[in-house]
Amino acid sequence: MSYLISKFFDEDQIKKIKSSYKYCTWNDGLESYTPKPGCVGHDIKKNLQTNLTNSEILYEGMDQNAEFLAYTIARSTRDPLITRTPTGGYYRCHYDHWQIGDFSTTIFLNDSDTYAGGELCLWIDNKEERFKLDPGWGITYETGTCHMVSEVVSGERDAVVFWTKSWIRDMKDLYEARYWDMMAKRYEEQTKCVYTDLKEFSENLESQFREKSYRIKRKYLRIDD
């Protein structure tokens, strides 16, 4: 399992996002969670959520985040949710449903010193990792990762959450394509802007690594044809 920490929004974008849901109607977070028979939903999840009527600014942040796009090889994204975890709120240990995507992302919206608790906790490589990021920064991880939101002791925690489907369905292929993209990027500065000799172009390392990545990605285009 792996994860990516990256920046989605700047300070001005954060202000616009907060302004857009300032007067919204908040719904019980259980609207997006069904507890097991015999279990009490609020014992597992106690938070609020809302949808933005205008979510263009959220998609703008995703589309401009090159690290996120390269990490997920994103194909599509479900409509983002704004979640609010007030004092006493939490989301106990759970897995996100397998149907919603390949990657889950949480983007923090509040200054970390305005609330206590509320860390996003991931079970990575047989140990718990806790995250509480600056506003506009998000963490993206494989949807099959066990995780929870620790109880908010004071203040309130606002976040954007969304799920992404990747072009690459096999995680082994995804890791390999990501590796070749990284290698191509590493040699990018050593590559000329223009080539007029096909042999020279085909033998430069960036071209070779890029083709290895593209070969994997093209396989999935054929599957969808």
Where are the predicted features?
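Catalytic core of non-heme Fe(II) oxygenases with the double-stranded beta-helix
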Residues: F68-R178
